[in-house]
Every structure is written in C-alpha cells, then in structure tokens.
C-alpha cells in the first residue's frame, strides 16, 4: 500500500503540474505477502479495452515488474474497473506464471489513468529460472537433466501439457538408470494452475546425501560402468557378453545382502546391496553393452524379489543374480524352471527357450 501511495503521489504531482485533478479510484484488498521487490515498468502504457488490459498486465508479470502506470485511451473508467477485476482473477487463478508467482494485484483508477502494483510470493530470480519446454517429453528431458545434476529444485513452464505422474516417472527413470541417479529423492510437486494447456510444474528434490557427495558417488559409479563396457568382448555373442558382465559384477566382492539408499554406489563400491540393486545394475550394464535386459519385480517363495530377464540370441531367459551367487555361476532359466517365483506374466516377454544344459562331473 505504501508503495502504491507513493506512486499515486508522483502521478498526482504530475497531474497538478499539468493543471488537472485526480478522481477517487478503488483498489482490491491486500493480503500479507511473502516476497516483495521493486522494479517499475519505466514506461506508461496505453490500453483501450479488456484485451489490451490483460495483455499489459500479463506482460508485467512475465517480466517480474511490480509497478506500472497505464493511460485509459477512450476506455470508460467504470468499464476499466470491471475489466480489471476480471483480469486480476485471470492472472492469479488461470495465467500460469501468475498462478505460480503472484500474491496480490492492487490498482487505482481515475482521470484516465490506471496505477498498478503487483506483489509476488516468488522472487524475480525464481521467475527468471523458469524453463520453457514443450509437451511431456520436453518436461521429462528437463527432469532427467536436473536428476543428473543432483539439483534440489526445478520449475518448468510446459506447453501442450497433459497429465503425467512425475513422481512415478522419476522412480522409473532411477530404476532404469542406476548409473545416473545415485539416490532416489523425495519429490514434492506443485502444478499451477489446475487446468489449461500450459502449466507451471514446480519440483523440489530432497536428498539425504549432500549434492557434493552425490556427485562424488556419480563420478565413481560412472567409472565402474565404463570399466564394465571395456570388460566385454566387442564381437562376442550374447551368451558370452552376459557371462562376462556377470563375472565383472559378481567377482568384485563377497556381497552383503542389505538395502541401501544409494543402491548402485553401495553395491559397486562396498559390496552391499539387495536383489533390486543387483538386478538394476546388471540390467543397465547389459543395455550399455548392446544387450537387451530388463528388471523384473515379483516374489520368490512369497518374499519380495527382483531379478532380470535377458535376451540371448532369439530367446529370453530369467537370471536371478542372488540364486546365481549361491550356485557360483550364471544360470539362465525358462518360465517353466521358475518354481516358487511369481511375477506379472503379461508385463514381460515369455521365456520359452531351450532349458540350459548343465554340465556335470562324471562319476568315478
């Protein structure tokens, strides 16, 4: 209010010097705001109707401006007041950046002038950091980049927006890319406004490890994945590559079966991991070496279990690294051989190849 009155005083002074008076206007009620910063528009804008008024106000919001003077060129003041109320409602409830950033809009109208003040709950720097992307695919690319950088926040303006489960997408990406996401963050999502083809998505990522520590982990894990790719013979067949990657991973440690919040890092650097960590890391190493591999979620003898389905030549097989560790070798199994296992059969390819021939030592 104080700033608006100061602006009004300046205009009154100008009007007095020009030999004109000022008529009483009106303004909307003011709520306490969290963030205020001063940046006036500098120029006087002329508006002559509701379309121009909306364009002028949204332009101020896009620029993070807090104050403006507008002349009402042939625009009846009573109509301007009515239209201004509609513009305020639109900007705060429906206009994406306004719904995200604006706390309150106040105004005075009189003698053919409109004085405007905008108060924000987001800082100018926060508004400037909004990234514009197109569609959900563009949003996903930006999210992946933020995860790779261990960022703590991300704000996107998404055109051609369609509903998407951001939290689930992040979880799925982390599972598919254990060499990129060291720790699955807690994710808070806010979307502004609640409808429309263009939305602001505000994401906050919360990690238990510091950004510096996560980046250190990422560097070490990427080096190990690079070593795994070099370990594989380039012209070998699928069966040989699968065996080589199995040896690379399983011969690193005498593993301790335990869950960690940094699955790939703990598994590859300290030999600590659970079935999920083994399956996700092995699948990622296989894919990076040109093999088809996926992680399966199910149960084994009634307990939660993760394992892999891999492609060997023309056939798919199950590989449970925890079972392989007990056997001391890579074991590929068909669906029929998966006694005690339960999974969503419709979500994965059938493993109906020839059962693996197991070599046995001849009896004396």
Predicted segments with their positions:
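Positively charged n-region of N-terminal signal peptides that target proteins for export
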Residues: 1-4
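Hydrophobic helical h-region of N-terminal Sec-dependent signal peptides
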Residues: 9-14
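C-terminal motif of bacterial Sec signal peptides marking the signal peptidase cleavage site
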Residues: 15-19
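N-terminal accessory/pre-domain segments preceding catalytic cores
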Residues: 21-234, 345-364
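Periplasmic OmpA-like peptidoglycan-binding domain that tethers envelope proteins to the cell wall
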Residues: 267-276
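Hydrophobic/aromatic-rich core segments of domains that either
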Residues: 277-342
């Amino acid at each position: 209010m104080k700033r608006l009155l100061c602006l009004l005083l300046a205009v009154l002074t100008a009007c007095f010097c020009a030999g004109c008076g000022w008529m009483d206007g009106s303004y909307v009620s003011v709520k306490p705001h969290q963030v205020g910063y001063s940046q006036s528009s500098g120029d006087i804008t002329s508006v002559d109707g509701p379309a121009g008024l909306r364009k002028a106000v949204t332009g101020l919001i896009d620029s993070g401006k807090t104050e403006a003077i507008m002349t009402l060129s042939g625009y009846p003041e009573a109509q301007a007041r009515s239209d201004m109320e509609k513009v305020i409602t639109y900007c705060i409830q429906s206009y994406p950046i306004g719904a995200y950033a604006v706390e309150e809009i106040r105004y005075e109208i009189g003698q053919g002038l409109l004085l405007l003040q905008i108060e924000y709950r987001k800082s100018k720097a926060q508004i400037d950091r909004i990234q514009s992307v197109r569609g959900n695919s563009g949003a996903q690319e930006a999210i992946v980049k933020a995860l790779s950088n261990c960022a703590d926040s991300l704000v996107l303006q998404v055109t051609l927006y369609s509903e998407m489960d951001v939290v689930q997408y992040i979880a799925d990406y982390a599972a598919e890319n254990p060499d990129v996401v060291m720790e699955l963050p807690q994710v808070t999502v806010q979307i502004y406004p609640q409808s429309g083809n263009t939305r602001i998505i505000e994401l906050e990522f919360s990690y238990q490890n510091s950004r510096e520590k996560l980046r250190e982990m990422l560097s070490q894990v990427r080096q190990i994945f690079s070593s795994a790719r070099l370990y594989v013979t380039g012209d070998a067949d699928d069966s040989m590559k699968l065996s080589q990657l199995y040896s690379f991973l399983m011969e690193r440690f005498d593993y301790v079966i335990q869950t960690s919040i940094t699955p790939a890092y703990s598994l590859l650097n300290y030999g600590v991991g659970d079935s999920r960590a083994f399956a996700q890391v092995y699948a990622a190493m296989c894919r990076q070496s040109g093999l088809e591999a996926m992680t399966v979620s199910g149960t084994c003898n009634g307990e939660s279990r993760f394992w892999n389905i891999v492609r060997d030549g023309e056939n798919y097989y199950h590989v449970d690294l925890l079972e392989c560790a007990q056997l001391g070798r890579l074991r590929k199994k068909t669906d029929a051989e998966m006694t005690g296992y339960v999974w969503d059969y419709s979500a994965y390819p059938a493993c109906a190849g020839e059962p693996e021939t197991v070599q046995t030592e001849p009896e004396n």
